[in-house]
Amino acid sequence: MIEPSMERENGALTAATTTTTAVTSPPPMASSPRQALVERLKDYGQEDIFSLWDELSPDEKDFLVRDIENLDLPRIDRIIRCSLHSQGLPVAAIEPVPENWVSTVDGRTMEDREKWWKMGLKTIYEGKLGVVLLSGGQGTRLGSSDPKGCFNIGLPSGKSLFQIQAERILCVQRLAAQVVSEGPIRPVTIHWYIMTSPFTDEATRKYFSSHKYFGLEPDQISFFQQGTLPCVTKDGKFIMETPFSLAKAPDGNGGVYAALKCSRLLEDMASRGIKYVDCYGVDNVLVRVADPTFLGYFIDKGAASAAKVVRKAYPQEQVGVFVRRGKGGPLTVVEYSELDQSMASAINQRTGRLQYCWSNVCLHMFTLDFLNQVATGLEKDSVYHLAEKKIPSMNGYTMGLKLEQFIFDSFPYAPSTALFEVLREEEFAPVKNVNGSNFDTPESARLLVLRLHTRWVIAAGGFLTHSVPLYATGVEVSPLCSYAGENLEAICRGRTFHAPCEISL
């Protein structure tokens, strides 16, 4: 559920008068709404919220009352109870994903790729694809308080993650119009649904507006907020961030399902004729937004959901992997900590790969029908993941629990799920940690982009000069020039580029 805004209001109370006595009635006592809320909170064991009531100013009392009134207490209590109860319960054993559930890079023919590419472009041309961006996070671990999508990883162009992704959408729209149109080329529009959080919403909207939506039409972008939930102690009590406000946190990237439903954007998608939804996380600089090949594969398989996967780099890599839960059970994702050493290292003797090798990289495709089903099913389920974190509280940081759903929590609901292998060096360059960390830094992502684009330019007949070792530099190809290395010959053949630089139109 998406909570309403909780900005302070300083409206004066209006005094009531009677004509018979001309005596002004006293203003309602601040304790009246408080007393009613205390009685409600007692039903859920949360009445301690008001323990410091007498020490609060009138404005603080008003803020606290409205903070509590804005909560769906029955829903939140159900989530807390169900989630705490689920801890420690036995779970079904896991099995490797069957080989025939995965479209591997080596197993695809050129004919497959061509067929899926054209199917995807035709579907995009017909307006049947929508794109959902998960971008509720701030760049805190990158040393920035801005929305993570505003981050510039240091490419020659200086473009942010948001701009790169917007320009990929522009490129796909152009490709669909050029390849599919019979007769005069008509414009193609992919609607972009951008999920923010209460912490990033205003800044994200302003960023897009100030950059003129990076060439997209303003009305083809819809912003919506994911929900928040109170942080709780290990026994389920609300944690107070200040004496007059609850500590809250976003409800995880799996909150996208409820957020789309509560914002009525699933209805909006249906009204636009959208049947398929591409969903991805903001912090992957190599993401192929609205990938026609992935879309065509998804349609060809007739699945309800699909995910791109990459092979684990090594047994101890700290990534979630796809598994089957229970004998012949549904597909789901388990964290690396759930795999013991022997399972993580086990080899499939037939393929020579790790048995549990398919890493989740938050690149998904869904049918709209399935999203509607999941939005209802996950809400009824009410079991959230409990993440133990340091929570800001009125007594300093304290250990507590954040309640989160994950995007992959939907997969057990799917009647069919397809996995689509992609190459890490082509489609997965995460930006999660500050430069100087061991992995997933802006610098490591920048180098992955430059190396990939350098290969594109050389394949298209271009040449490079460089004053530093080539492994530390390269060229950047603007998404407005090429989506995945295509159509570069006219720009690159016979030309020499001095790295680092951006190749643009």
Curated annotation (Swiss-Prot):
Superkingdom is: Eukaryota
Regulation of its activity: Inhibited by hygromycin and streptomycin, but not by gentamycin or kanamycin.
Provide the Gene Ontology terms for cellular component: plasma membrane
Q: Where is this motif: Substrate binding?
A: 134-137, 335-336
Which pathway does this polypeptide act in?
A: Nucleotide-sugar biosynthesis; UDP-N-acetyl-alpha-D-glucosamine biosynthesis; UDP-N-acetyl-alpha-D-glucosamine from N-acetyl-alpha-D-glucosamine 1-phosphate: step 1/1
Region span, Disordered: 1-32
> Which residues are noted in the entry as substrate-binding?
253, 432
The EC number(s) this enzyme carries = 2.7.7.23, 2.7.7.83
Similarity field: Belongs to the UDPGP type 1 family.
What this chain does, per the entry, is described as: Uridylyltransferase involved in the biosynthesis of UDP-glucosamine, an essential precursor for glycoprotein and glycolipid synthesis. Can use both UDP-glucosamine and the 4-epimer UDP-galactosamine as substrates, but no other sugars or NTPs. Acts redundantly with GLCNAC1PUT2. Required for gametogenesis and embryo development.
Cite the PANTHER family for this sequence: UDP- GLUCOSE PYROPHOSPHORYLASE, UDP-N-ACETYLGLUCOSAMINE DIPHOSPHORYLASE 1
Kindly provide the name given to this protein in its UniProt entry: UDP-N-acetylglucosamine diphosphorylase 1
Instruction: Identify the species of origin.
Output: Arabidopsis thaliana (Mouse-ear cress)
The organism's taxonomy opens as:
Eukaryota, Viridiplantae, Streptophyta, Embryophyta, Tracheophyta
